[in-house]
Structures are given as structure tokens and as C-alpha cells.
Swiss-Prot record:
It catalyses: Couples ATP hydrolysis with the unwinding of duplex DNA by translocating in the 3'-5' direction; ATP + H2O = ADP + phosphate + H(+). This is ATP-dependent DNA helicase Hel308. Disulfide bonds: none annotated. It comes from the Archaea. A motif (DEAH box) lies at residues 143-146. SUPFAM superfamilies: Hedgehog/intein (Hint) domain, Homing endonucleases, P-loop containing nucleoside triphosphate hydrolases, Sec63 N-terminal domain-like, Winged helix' DNA-binding domain. The gene is hel308. DNA-dependent ATPase and 3'-5' DNA helicase that may be involved in repair of stalled replication forks. It comes from Methanocaldococcus jannaschii (strain ATCC 43067 / DSM 2661 / JAL-1 / JCM 10045 / NBRC 100440) (Methanococcus jannaschii). Monomer.
Length: 1195
């Protein structure tokens, strides 16, 4: 328990939620006890699973054990999100985290990982490759375990759980509220945790007759501004500053409802301008824009939008972004779901203005609690606000943003999002403490890296003029402190001699050393850089930095700081960047230099400006001391002296000081207190002012004093002397006198201090007080600090805001950065040292969730939407830290709807049932079990089925036994198995993870094929179950389709065949580069559906290719089609498409310009660069092993 709580504290979690406490109390940490957690959304289910994982994977010392854990999620996107979240949390303890969501026909080696994040289908496919590491798994967490009820996917999850039950593993099931949790828990032999606690109050109600009737009896009248109920509900919420989600039963209804919700009259002029920009962006995604794009753009202009699977990823992302910014006020959906121009964003080469970012570099973003480089970002311009907010922190950071830009704030131990206009002085905002990069080692020793660092700082490598190297490499140093290069092979190999000139020593090196530096891409003078070393492992990078500071760095005892000087701005910026990897903070300033006159010829020489990097806060100096192995004896001595400073030694362990004046206040329980900053000011001006104040206090010992101009004692900074005086206004004059505390303090100082102007002496006297002068009790002493340990949180430092102000702006635009919505990041970027929202986040906070439809069309006609699904929809209302409450509203059109709505809001959700009797599930799963040897005869089969959830629920296996016998007969008749032994075909189909019936369709089609036509192969894959549902065929299309099919030798013309052939025609257009908009219009589909069909087609074409090899029907056409389907391109550019960084657009450009093969690219690098740009060309050539512009490093 202590280990768990200690690790949770590392994440800032100091108190568990009620369901989490209940799980621990019931024995969650018993490794042999399964659990089923059935609680509402956002109640903390995931953390319960994490506690179980921690318990298995980390020992008492927080080190990895030899066990593995699996975290199963329902969707790939969620898997990516959890992967990044868990990496950021647990890699610090040495846990290796893996994400496994790739191709099903892929045998990944996951044996070296401790925690594997995956989907049920991917784990099932891995199992079929007979993974050995499964024996090391001791805990499995299943998120959304209620999906065992899903018609198509539930059977796979049930089979997996049945297998896992036979292993010695702890199973933790995380579920939404379901109707029969006890039944599922009993099958799992699990402790059941049921709780209805929510972090934000959810008000549930029914809308009917222009009023919301809440379940708690409250009634809210809704003003009818239109005859549309949804419009009235939305307007009522929007007027109060809220946003709405409207859940519809179909994509078409979502679109139609969004079109009706015209909210223009409730939009400000600024919002209208910004929505117009967003609408234009929507229209720019596809060229030319589709009808759906145009409809969505029109809705956005009105403040509404629709959101469903038919939209492309880019469209959905833009809608989510605008809703998150509260520009779009309402989204109608199906039940799925700005910065100043001078702002500097942290990239891999350092901080750059947002308007000048390098497109080829990643930006640093928050990923969980770690700050890492993220690719796939974009910059967007938005109209500037009439005013901006300037935020300054205690630690000296400053940023200017639009009023609605979102900051991450810590309040009372919990995280909140706040817009800039809502921030206040004293708030703790997230700033960067350290950054993390993907490390890349170089074959250089620590000694060589130290040598290189020293040479970059104080070395001269000569110059190249007209391709000729002039001068020799030279390293200057103080002979009193010669550099220690004993462990440097580079020094030993290329050293020539040592000479001393005018008291300065010089090491002279061979010109060959310059060539080595050139290969490392290090330039000379003001262009020096350390590009090649920025991503070194920290233990090696430390030696390079040590060399830099031992040569051009300075340790100042009097200032108590560290500085580095260089005329190379780039070098100093890169140094600032790499220091952040150690959590070492620094600032950069430019120091102007004067013109020098030569004493020999009298000529004036303009000196280059010097860039100074300064490390001044104690934590950074301490980290520098602990991580950077300086070899310069004098510098090391000074650094040690700073660290061992007597005053620093007085700081208690629970605090870390930022400044070096340790005692800032003395106080007693009786109420006596003295702010000592009055006696130890930080500036000369403050010192003079405070002398006047203290002199006044001594004068007041004699009694009341008339002050004619008290402003000379006043400062905009703290005025601690006000604690000791009373000011009265009599007849327009200001009279001062000491209060009781003032009389005690000044009497004490008057008695013990001789020099009444010596503030230092007064300070030392008060610091050494042990007992209170009023009551005699012990004196407490408080440090002058601003950094506390609790302010450090992963890679975040919570800095306190010291100033906020509004400023008018003249800029036309503000800027946003969009980060990829792939689970790789937390949608916060590093800007001016702050961690601010990238304004394109994932969450869709809403005040009111509205369920418009209670029914939807199924294969059995119109049916009520399950209560569990409705409760999940309304559970979206009310986000912690964002809404004071949430409202889940169901619209009742009649009395029947009212009754159903009441049931949905008050009754338990429906029970979940096993879907194992589904023949499609049984075909795939039984073949998999036989192929892996888990079932070898009828007895194994019966024993396995009796352990399933199906058997637990129904007891009688007669119905499922009938289906099982039919499936076994099918597998035998089609030669997938023989006497419960898999054939080669059966094994391969199991590994390919397709339905055996789909494999039969493919085999039959290949054997009946008369002509090898591309369209025929596409027809074969379109007939598979994995491609269902196919495109709808209209009566007017049937005859033409039959004629085309007949010409290919296809003799079956059932409606399913016609639909498969129409789908094949769509895929054929795709691979022949027909414009996307034309495909969408021709086949009456949406962009998202096209993407889905293409992804599945790539998978099934791969399966067809593999099956064709086994049955002797191999051909190169399927292999080419697999690539062409992936890229949507013609055959002539396939070779080019096989190269990383080349998509169909670049491939077509290269091909049309005569670059048609890999050999052409290698032989014509300049031409390639002129066609697609030098940066991309360099990446492509590097991928092909050809260096562009530089040679490989070799000694």
C-alpha cells in the first residue's frame, strides 16, 4: 500500500476518490484476486487498473519486477493515448512500455517489455503466433469490459478472457454501469466494485412541453424562441455561456439538425470573423471541396457543426478545436465521438518565434508529465483580439496571449484549465522544468566529447578559402590550469606540440583534426554549433557541456551564478536547449561590444556582439553541480563553495531556495512577526529607501510624528514597515506612531544596535533571536524562497504569477499551433517557457448533453437505443474543472418517449450477454484455438466452451453446440483443419486474422478466375465479410453492373455480388488517381467512409496475396495492388512509393520529371532536390543510404 501511495504522490495524487479507496479496502493489492469495477465515466476507473499494474510490475524499491502486464483498450486511438500517458508516468521507474496495434499479420517481439498496451483483436492475433512471453504476464487490465456485449467484437474479448482465466493472472475489468455486473463478476471470479460517485454533479432531466423536468423534482422553464425543441434547448444553454452536444441516431439526422441551428444572433463580431476563417479552412481540406465540406462550412458560419465518422480526420479535428475554443456553440453528433507573433516556441534546435518555426523540426509538447518533441504540428493564423494579456511569473518568465488562450493551472493540488483573462496574481501556472528527447548516441568516448566541447569553446580550427584549408587547429588556455585530455583519443592522435605566447598556452593540432570536426558539422567562429550532439545520452552529453564551460564558462562567487560567453548566437541557444535536458534553467542576453583601435596600425575594428548565457537559480546550479563533471580545478572549487555556502546549508530539506538570502521572516505563535526583507533588501535603491524607513521607526519611539510627505517612504514593492506603524489623518496632515509590535521591535533594536543605519547588523541580530521578545516562546524562522518541492511535477515546474496586465495590440493576426490528435501528446506546447494549450485539444467539454433520438434503425427495424448507450451519452456532460455541473437531457416527443426517457434516466442499464453463439465469431475463434494447439479434440473443445461467459449465463450448451458443430464441419470441408489439427492453409488464415469464410470466398474466386484483371482482384476482396457493408446498388445501375461482371467471367449476379462489384469499382477509381471529390460524388459516399474502405482493402489484399501463394495462384498483381491501395496511385509510381517520405503527389511529380526509379533518385540528387525541395530530398537520400552534402563520420 505504501509503495502505491508513494508513486501516486509522484503524480500529484494525494487523495483517492471513493471508488478507488473502496477497491483498495476490498483487496485490490491481493495479486490472486480479480476485480470488476463498474462505475460512471470520469470517476477514476483507470487509476484502479494502474494501481494493480504498479503492484505487479514494481517492487518495494520502485524497481521493475520480472513480471508483465497487459492493458486492453477497445480502440487503436485509445491505445495510443494510454501508451503515451503510461510512458510519461512509468518509464521513470525503469518500466518499458510497448504499444501493439499494428498489422494483424505481424509477429512482434514484445518479450523485453514490462507493460503492453493493445486491443483485444491485436492480442488475439499475437496469441496465434504462439507468443512465449504470455507466460510472464501476471496482470491484465481490460478497459470497457462491457464490450463483451458487442455483436461483432464481443466474442473475441470473451475468448481472450476465457484463456486468461486459465493463467495465473490477476484480471481487472473496468466497465461502464451495466445491468448485470454481478453475473460478469461471478464468471470472472472477481470482487465487484459498484459505485455511483461522480466528480461533477450530473443533473438528469426530460424536456417536454417547453420545460425540463429534472429527476430530482426541479423544473426549468425553457423560453420558446422557435418551434424547434433542440434549438430552444441550445439557445437556453448558450445564453448562459455553455456549449451543447446533441446526439442524433444517424449521420444524416446530425447534419440536418446542425443546419437548423442558426446561432448567428448570439455570436459576437469577433466570433463571426473567426468562424469565417474556420469555414474557409474547412473548404480548403479537399480540392475541390465536397458538398459535405460546403454544408459543414455553412453550419460553422452559424455557430453550429456536425461530427460523425463520415468526416475526414482533418474536418473532425477542426470542429473539435473550434468547439474547444467555444467558437462553435453546439455540435450535432452520432454517439461517437492564440499566441502573440513574438512568442517563442521550443523546437529541437532551441526557442524560435512562432512565425519563424523550422518545418523540419519537432516542437516540444507536454506528453503526460514529460516534455518531449512531437512531429506533425501545424501553425494557424487567426484574427488578433483587440487586446492581449501579458502574464509574468516570479521566476521571470513572460508571455503575451489572446484573452481566451488556455493555461494549465494548479489549484489546491488539482489541475485546472484557465483562460488567460481568468488568471490572477498568485495562481500557479505550468512552466517547463526539463525536456526529453529521443536519444541518439555517437561513437565517441567521454574524453573525446570533453575535448570537443573544450575546442568549441576556446579552439580555433582554421578557415577554408577557395577550397583550401589555411592555418592549423589551435587551442588556447591559461597555463596555470591546463585542460585534462588524458582520456581523449582525438587529442592523442592529432596533437602536434605546445607553445606559449605572451603568457597564453597553445596546443597545436594536425589539420586532419579540422576534417574530423567538419564531418561532425561543426563550423567556426560565430557559426559554431553542436547539432550533432544535442540528442546524446545525458551521461555523455554532460562531458561535452563540461568542456564548453571549462573553456568559455565562468563561476562567479560574488554573484553566485554561472555564465557562458560566445560570439555564436546559435551555439548559446543550443546550449540553453541541451541544459534544459538536465533541468538546468538559463537566460540569454546580448552584450554589445565597442569598436577597438589597433595599437600597431591605428585601424578601427568592430568587435562582434557577445551572447551571454546565465544560470542563476539555485536548483539549476545544484543540478549543474550534480550532473556536469567540470575538470577545471578552480571552477570546480568555486562551484562547490557556492553549493556549500553556509546560508544555503540553513535551508530546511523540505524547501529548495531560489534566492540566496535564506531567512526572510521570523515569527511566533503569539502573533509577533518581522518581515526581514526590510533589513536585507536586494537592490541599492531599496537599501537607501529602507534606511529612511528604519530611521523613521527609531524616531517614532519618542512618540507621534507629523509626516508632511509620506510618499518618499512608499514603494510599489512590499512595504513591510507598515506592519509596525499606525497612520492617522488629522486636519489634512498624516501622523505616524508605532503600534504595539513596532514598539517591541524598535525598543529591542534600540537597546542592542549601536549604528542605527546599519541594516546588516540589525538583520543578523534578528536572525539569531531564539525567543520571542513578547511571550518568550521559541521563534520560528522562514526562508526567502519561491521554489518548493511540491512545485516540481514530472517535467513541469509550477511557477507563481506575479503580474497580469492587459495591453492593446496592433497586430492583425495571432497564431495557434495544432498538434497531432493521435494520442502522442497532451496538447500543451512550450512557449516562452510556459506550458500552454495548443488550442487544438481532444476534450469536448459541454454543459448540456442532449439526446434527440431514443430509437434508431437496425437490421430488425426501428429499435430503442440501449439505456447503457444513452447513459454514456449524457455522462459526457460536466467536465471536472471546466463546468460547475452537467446536464443530461432527453427530448421526449410524446408520452411513449417520456416513459422511455424516464426509464433511461432512472433504471439500471440493460444486462450484457455473451455473443459467442455468433457463427462468424465461432469460425474465427475456433480456427485460432485449433491452430495454436489449445484445442486438440472434442474433449478440449467442450471443456473450453464450458468455461466461457456463454456457458456461465445459459448453462445449456445445446444451442451453441449446434453452431459449433456446423463451424467444425465447415473448417474440415474447406481443409482448414483435419481431425482438430490445422493444415498449412488453416494456420496461415488464422495468422492473417480473417474470417475463414472470407478465405473461402478468396480461394473460390482465385480458382474460378479466367483473366487476371485488377478489377477482379478488387471484386474478390470486396466479397469478404471484413469489407461489409458494401456500397448500395440502385435499380438503375443493375444492368450496367451485370454487363461488366459478365465480361470478366463472373456468373453470380445476386444483390450481394452487385454491391461487391460496385465497391470494387470505387477502389479501382481510387488506385487510378481519380480525384477524391469525383469518387465521393460518383458513389454517393462520405470522405470518412472512403478512408475506412481503403484501409480494410489494404489488409484483405495482403491476405489474398498470402493465400494465393499457398494454393499455387501466386501473382505479382496483388502485391502491387496492396501498395496502390495504400497510396491511391497508378502502377507506374509503385517503386517510388516504396520509399519513405514519398507519397503519391511527390511520386507523380518525380515521375513526370523523369525520375522513375530508386536508381534515378540516387543518380540525380540535385534534380530531385529541385523538384521536391532540398530538405525532403536530403531525408529521402538518407533513407536510401546516400549522404547529401556530407560524408559519414569515420576516424
Amino acid at each position: 500500500m505504501d509503495k502505491i501511495l508513494e508513486i501516486l504522490k509522484d503524480f500529484g495524487i494525494v487523495e483517492l476518490r471513493p471508488p478507488q479507496k473502496k477497491a483498495l479496502e476490498r483487496g485490490l493489492l491481493d495479486k490472486n484476486k480479480n476485480f470488476l469495477i463498474s462505475i460512471p465515466t470520469a470517476s477514476g476507473k483507470t487509476l484502479i487498473g494502474e494501481m494493480a499494474l504498479i503492484n505487479h510490475l514494481l517492487d518495494g524499491n520502485k524497481n521493475p519486477t520480472n513480471k508483465k502486464g497487459i492493458f486492453i483498450v477497445p480502440l487503436k486511438a485509445l491505445a495510443s493515448e494510454k501508451y503515451e500517458e503510461f510512458k510519461s508516468k512509468y518509464e521513470r521507474y525503469g518500466l518499458r512500455i510497448a504499444l501493439s496495434i499494428g498489422d494483424y499479420d505481424e509477429d512482434e517481439d514484445l518479450s523485453k517489455y514490462h507493460l503492453i498496451i493493445t486491443t483485444a483483436e491485436k492480442l488475439d492475433s499475437l496469441w496465434r503466433h504462439k507468443i512465449d512471453w504470455i507466460n510472464d504476464v501476471s496482470v491484465v487490465v481490460v478497459d470497457e469490459i462491457h464490450l463483451i456485449n458487442d455483436e461483432t467484437r464481443g466474442g473475441t474479448l470473451e475468448i481472450l478472457l476465457t484463456k486468461l482465466k486459465e493463467f495465473n493472472v490477476q484480471i481487472i475489468g473496468l466497465s461502464a454501469t451495466i445491468g448485470n455486473p454481478d453475473e460478469l463478476a461471478e464468471w470472472l471470479n472477481a470482487e465487484l466494485i459498484v459505485d455511483d460517485w461522480r466528480p461533477v454533479e450530473l443533473k438528469k432531466g426530460i424536456y417536454k412541453n417547453e420545460a425540463i423536468e429534472f429527476i430530482n423534482g426541479e423544473i426549468r422553464e425553457i423560453k420558446a424562441v422557435d418551434n424547434n425543441d433542440i434549438y430552444n434547448l441550445v439557445v437556453d444553454c448558450v445564453k448562459e455561456g455553455g456549449c451543447c452536444l446533441v446526439f442524433c441516431n444517424t449521420k444524416r439526422n446530425a447534419v440536418n439538425e446542425a443546419k437548423k441551428l442558426n446561432l448567428k444572433k448570439f455570436l459576437t463580431e469577433e466570433e463571426k470573423i473567426r468562424l469565417k476563417e474556420i469555414a474557409e479552412e474547412i473548404l480548403s481540406i479537399l480540392e475541390p471541396p465536397t458538398e459535405m465540406c460546403k454544408t459543414l462550412a455553412e453550419c460553422i458560419l452559424n455557430g453550429s457543426a456536425f461530427h460523425h465518422a463520415g468526416l475526414t480526420y482533418q474536418h473532425r479535428k477542426i470542429v473539435e478545436d473550434a468547439f474547444r475554443k467555444r467558437l462553435i456553440k453546439v455540435i450535432c453528433c452520432t454517439p461517437t465521438l492564440c499566441l502573440n507573433a513574438n512568442t517563442e516556441i521550443l523546437q529541437e534546435s532551441g526557442f524560435r518565434k512562432i512565425t519563424e518555426l523550422n518545418k523540419d523540426e519537432k516542437v516540444f509538447a507536454l506528453c503526460g508529465k514529460e516534455i518531449k518533441p512531437v512531429d506533425g504540428w501545424k501553425v494557424h493564423k487567426t484574427p488578433q483580439h483587440e487586446y492581449n494579456i501579458v502574464v509574468k511569473t516570479v521566476n521571470g518568465l513572460e508571455i503575451t496571449t489572446t484573452p481566451n488562450h488556455i493555461f494549465l493551472v494548479k489549484e489546491n493540488g488539482s489541475l485546472k484549465e484557465k483562460e488567460a483573462k481568468d488568471l490572477k496574481v498568485g495562481d500557479y501556472v505550468a512552466t517547463v522544468d526539463r525536456i526529453r528527447v529521443k536519444e541518439k548516441d555517437i561513437d565517441l568516448s567521454n574524453g573525446d566529447l570533453y575535448f570537443i566541447g573544450y575546442f568549441i569553446g576556446d579552439g580555433y580550427t582554421g578557415v577554408i578559402e577557395k577550397n583550401t584549408l589555411k592555418a592549423t587547429p589551435d587551442l588556447a588556455f591559461n597555463p596555470k590550469y591546463p585542460p585534462n585530455f588524458d582520456d581523449s583519443e582525438l587529442h592523442k592522435k592529432y596533437f602536434l606540440k605546445c607553445r606559449i605566447s605572451k603568457g597564453v598556452a597553445h596546443y597545436i593540432y594536425s589539420k586532419k583534426l579540422r576534417k574530423i570536426f567538419n564531418k561532425l558539422n561543426m563550423l567556426t567562429k560565430d557559426n559554431k554549433n553542436i547539432d550533432a550532439f544535442c540528442n546524446l545520452p545525458l551521461d555523455k552529453l554532460a562531458y561535452l557541456i563540461a568542456g564548453l564551460f571549462d573553456s568559455d564558462g565562468y563561476i562567479y562567487l560574488n554573484r553566485k551564478n554561472i555564465e557562458f560567453y560566445s560570439i555564436s548566437e546559435k551555439l548559446v541557444e543550443q546550449l540553453q536547449f541541451v541544459l534544459l535536458r538536465f533541468g538546468i534553467h538559463s537566460s540569454i542576453r546580448k552584450k554589445k561590444t565597442k569598436t577597438m583601435v589597433s595599437p600597431t596600425n591605428g585601424k578601427e575594428y568592430k568587435c562582434k556582439d557577445i551572447y551571454v548565457l546565465t544560470i542563476r537559480d539555485f536548483m539549476s546550479i545544484k543540478r549543474f553541480y550534480e550532473n556536469i563533471p567540470l575538470r577545471h580545478e578552480e571552477k570546480r572549487r568555486k562551484l562547490e563553495e557556492i553549493i556549500k555556502n553556509k546560508e544555503i546549508g540553513q535551508i530546511p530539506s523540505e524547501f529548495v531556495a531560489l534566492r540566496f538570502t535564506p531567512i526572510a521572516k521570523i515569527w511566533c505563535d503569539c502573533g509577533f512577526s518581522v518581515d526581514l526583507t526590510m533589513f536585507k533588501p536586494r537592490t541599492k535603491r531599496q537599501r537607501e529607501l529602507n534606511k529612511k524607513r528604519v530611521k523613521l521607526l527609531f524616531e517614532l519611539l519618542d512618540g507621534k510624528k507629523l509626516i508632511t510627505n509620506y510618499k518618499e517612504y512608499y514603494s510599489k514593492r512590499k512595504n513591510p514597515y507598515f506592519d509596525f506603524i499606525v497612520r492617522e489623518k488629522i486636519n489634512g496632515n498624516n501622523y505616524y506612531s508605532l503600534n504595539e509590535k513596532g514598539r517591541v521591535l524598535m525598543s529591542l533594536l534600540n537597546k542592542h544596535i549601536k549604528d542605527k543605519e546599519n541594516l546588516e547588523e540589525m538583520y543578523n541580530f534578528l536572525v539569531n533571536l531564539e525567543k520571542c521578545p513578547i511571550c518568550g516562546k521559541p521563534i520560528h524562522k522562514e526562508m526567502r524562497y519561491s521554489w518548493k518541492k511540491e512545485c516540481y511535477d514530472g517535467d513541469i515546474y509550477w511557477d507563481r504569477i506575479k503580474e497580469i496586465k492587459k495591453i492593446k495590440v496592433n497586430d492583425k493576426y495571432a497564431y495557434d499551433i495544432e498538434l497531432p490528435d493521435d494520442g502522442s501528446n497532451s496538447h500543451y506546447i512550450v512557449a516562452n517557457g510556459f506550458i500552454v494549450h495548443n488550442s487544438a485539444g481532444l476534450n469536448l467539454p459541454c454543459r448540456r448533453a442532449i439526446v434527440k433520438d431514443l430509437t434508431r434503425f437496425t437490421n430488425k427495424g426501428m429499435r430503442y437505443i440501449p439505456i447503457m448507450e444513452i447513459q454514456q451519452c449524457i455522462g459526457r456532460a460536466g467536465r471536472p474543472g471546466l463546468d460547475p455541473y452537467g446536464e443530461g437531457i432527453i427530448v421526449a416527443k410524446n408520452d411513449r418517449d417520456y416513459l422511455r426517457a424516464y426509464q433511461a434516466l432512472t433504471q439500471k442499464p440493460e444486462p450484457i450477454y455473451s455473443k459467442l453463439s455468433n457463427q462468424a465469431v465461432l469460425r474465427t475463434q475456433l480456427l485460432g484455438l485449433i491452430a495454436t494447439g489449445e484445442i486438440r479434440d472434442e474433449y478440449d473443445l467442450e471443456w473450453f466452451i464450458r468455461n466461457t461467459f456463454y456457458a456461465h449465463q445459459y448453462g445449456n450448451l445445446r444451442e451453441v453446440a449446434k453452431n459449433i458443430n456446423e463451424v467444425i464441419r465447415f473448417l474440415e470441408e474447406n481443409e482448414f483443419i483435419i481431425d482438430f489439427m490445422p493444415t498449412e492453409l488453416g494456420k496461415r488464415v488464422s495468422e492473417l486474422y480473417i474470417d475463414p469464410l472470407s478465405a473461402k470466398f478468396i480461394i473460390d474466386g482465385l480458382e474460378e478466375m479466367e483473366n487476371e484483371e485488377e478489377i477482379y482482384y478488387l471484386y474478390l476482396i470486396s466479397k469478404t465479410l471484413e469489407m461489409m457493408p458494401n456500397l448500395r446498388v440502385y435499380n438503375s445501375e443493375e444492368l450496367n453492373l451485370i454487363d461488366e461482371m459478365d465480361s470478366l467471367g463472373i456468373k453470380s449476379f445476386e444483390i450481394e455480388d452487385l454491391e461487391a462489384f460496385k465497391t470494387a469499382k470505387m477502389l479501382y477509381d481510387w488506385i487510378n488517381e481519380v480525384p477524391e471529390d469525383e469518387i465521393l460524388k460518383r458513389y454517393k459516399i462520405e470522405p470518412g467512409i472512403l478512408r475506412y474502405k481503403v484501409e480494410n482493402a489494404v489488409w484483405i489484399m495482403h491476405a489474398l496475396k498470402e493465400i494465393a501463394k499457398l494454393i499455387g495462384k501466386s501473382s505479382d498483381i496483388p502485391e502491387k495492388l496492396e501498395i496502390r491501395l495504400e497510396y491511391g496511385a497508378k502502377e507506374d509510381i509503385i517503386e517510388l512509393l516504396s520509399i519513405k517520405y514519398i507519397g503519391r503527389v511527390r511520386a507523380r511529380k518525380l515521375y513526370n520529371a523523369g525520375i522513375r526509379s530508386i536508381e534515378d533518385i540516387i543518380n540525380n540528387p540535385s534534380k530531385v532536390a529541385s523538384i521536391i525541395g532540398e530538405k525532403i530530398a536530403k531525408k529521402i537520400l538518407d533513407e536510401l543510404g546516400v549522404k547529401f552534402g556530407q560524408q559519414k563520420l569515420s576516424f
